[in-house]
Amino acid sequence: MRSSAVVSYIRGVSDSDREDLGAMFAWVTRRLVDAEEPLLAANGLTMWEYVVLAQLARRPAPNQLTLAREIRHDKTRLIALLDQLQQRGLIDRQPDAADRRSHTVSITSQGRALHATVRAAIRKMEAEFLSVLSPDHRRSLLAILPRLVLPEGNPADDC
C-alpha cells in the first residue's frame, strides 16, 4: 500500500512542494529491500549476510574491524554473523600472521558461488524495478547514484 505522501508525489506536485529527498529515497529503498528479502531468503541469506559476502567478493578484509567499518556494521555484532557464515562454509577466517589477535576474513569458493547466484537474481529484480524508466534514464540513474553515495574526493578515503 502506498502512503498518501507517495501518491501525492506521484500525481505531480511543484518542486517546492515535493517530498524531501530522504523521504523519496526511503520509499525506493523500502521497495528494493522488500523485493530483495525473498530472493535472499530463498538462498538462505539475511540482508547482512549478503552484505558481508558482497564486500568480501570485492576484496578480502585485512581484519574483522576493517570489515565492520567497510560495511558500516556494529563490530560487536559482526562476530556472530561471521561465525554463522563460517560454519556454513561461506567465509574463512585466519589468524593474521602479523598480529595473531586479529583475523583476516575472505570468501570461500562456496560463498563466491552463492553470492554470484544471489547477485544475478537481484540484478534481474532490479531490471524489472527500473523497467518503468527509459533506457537513457536507467543509464543516467545508475551513473548518478555512485556520485551521491561516495563523498567528494577520492572514494577510497571513505573506506
Model-derived features: positions:
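Short, locally clustered residues in the helix-turn-helix/winged-helix DNA-binding domain
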Residues: 26-29, 54-58, 119, 146
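Active-site phosphate/pyrophosphate-handling residues
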Residues: 20-23, 51, 66, 77, ...
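Conserved acidic
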Residues: 17-24, 28, 77, 103, ...
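Conserved alpha-helix in the HATPase_c
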Residues: 80
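Charged, amphipathic alpha-helical coiled-coil/dimerization segments
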Residues: 3-4, 33, 61, 65, ...
